[in-house]
Amino acid sequence: YENRRKYLDDSPISVVAVLNNADMREEHDIAVERYEQRADELNIDIDVRENITSADLARVFESRNDLVHFIGHSDEQGLECADGFLSIESVSESNTQTFFLNACGSYHEGVGLVRKGSVAGGVTFEAVTDSQAAEVGTTFARLMVLGYSLERALDKARQQVMTPKDYAVVGDGTHVLTQSDAGIPPTHRLVDDGDGYTLKVDQLAPWNKGGEAGEQFDHQEHEYHLNAQHRSYNFSRAELLNAIDIFENPVVYDGTLHWPDELANLL
């Protein structure tokens, strides 16, 4: 929590995507695409690095960055690099605000970054398959730029795989990197009632208790409400499809996280 004070300026958001495993290029390319989607709107600077050395990776963490998304491998020696491994113990200090170490067993390296100055980050406990890592990594990237906190972004992202407990947040999981258009990004849960649908909305956030959040279900202006759990809205199928057409955020339907375009094809 104390590390937040290091990152209170209003400079452009700097994102560094590091690919140190060529087999995971698909995750890397999609993640970069997700960060680029709101780059102009949010003033995000994106730096792409590939197959870098341990010294170069150390400089990435020591430099002022808002998010480092590392894609590769790790073991007890540290994060794998082109010339060996980087142990975070050898990093003088971390000036990287947040991070996602999408590498097998990256927990200890993540804890090390928080101890050396980062606010929070996503890590893994055990070995994860490349396909699982890609699914979690790309979903995490998309949620972060939509304004979700690290904990909520990783929680939703790991719901996409069979072994969600392999992922966790170290540091302050309530930390937010970008601002949502709705003030607080909503959690949408959709229930099929047979003759229609019920959409349940949760927009609580620990930093905005007693505040307001916006919702938009058609092409009109946002409606603003005091933060509260379990607001419910009833829709016909046609009304729901119209609402989904302008959604940016995912919807949990039948126990699975769906993006709006995917959900529209299921209804």
Model-flagged regions — what are they?
Residues 3, 20-21, 43, 51, ...:
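Detector for Asparagine
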Residues 85, 148-267:
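Caspase-like cysteine protease fold
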Residues 1-67:
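A domain-level signal for caspase-like cysteine endopeptidase catalytic cores
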Residues 44-52, 124-129, 154-155:
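A generic structural motif
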Residues 21, 74, 105, 127, ...:
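A broadly conserved detector of short glycine/acidic/proline-rich loop/turn motifs that flank catalytic sites
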Residues 1-6, 90, 180-181:
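Short intrinsically disordered, low-complexity coil segments enriched in acidic
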Residues 70-150:
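Catalytic cores of nucleophile-dependent amide-cleaving enzymes
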